[in-house]
């Protein structure tokens, strides 16, 4: 009986971009979750004005950095929205 080995085929020309896409997708998911949590806290009145300002600036900075990284790897925002099949899109 012979066992058939499965090989993972990787394209060396796109492996860096594909890895960047995966990592940036996870970071974008976390960024969106943090943004939603911050909005809930602001709407709930849980934060001081200074905290609101700091969170807002931090989220804006993170969004800017994400844009720079997407540009560096030739990715568009929609490239980070993975299709999860029957579950629908990730983001």
UniProtKB/Swiss-Prot annotation:
Family: Belongs to the gas vesicle GvpK family.
Subcellular location: Gas vesicle
Alphabetical GO biological process terms: gas vesicle organization
GO CC annotation terms, alphabetical: gas vesicle
Domain of life, source organism: Bacteria
Name of the protein described by the UniProt record: Gas vesicle protein K
Inducing stimuli: Gas vesicle production is induced by growth conditions that promote production of secondary metabolites tiancimycin A and B.
Function comment: Might be involved in nucleating gas vesicle formation. Gas vesicles are hollow, gas filled proteinaceous nanostructures found in some microorganisms. It is not clear what function gas vesicles perform in soil bacteria.
PANTHER family in alphabetical order: PROTEIN GVPK 1
């Amino acid at each position: 009986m012979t066992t058939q080995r499965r090989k993972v085929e990787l394209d060396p020309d796109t492996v860096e971009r594909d890895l960047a896409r995966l990592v940036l997708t996870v970071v974008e998911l976390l960024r969106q979750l943090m943004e939603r949590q911050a909005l809930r806290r602001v709407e709930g009145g849980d934060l001081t004005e200074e905290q609101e300002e700091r969170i807002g600036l931090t989220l804006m900075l993170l969004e800017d950095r994400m844009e720079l990284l997407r540009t560096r790897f030739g990715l568009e925002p929609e490239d980070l929205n993975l299709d999860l099949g029957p579950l629908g899109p990730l983001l």
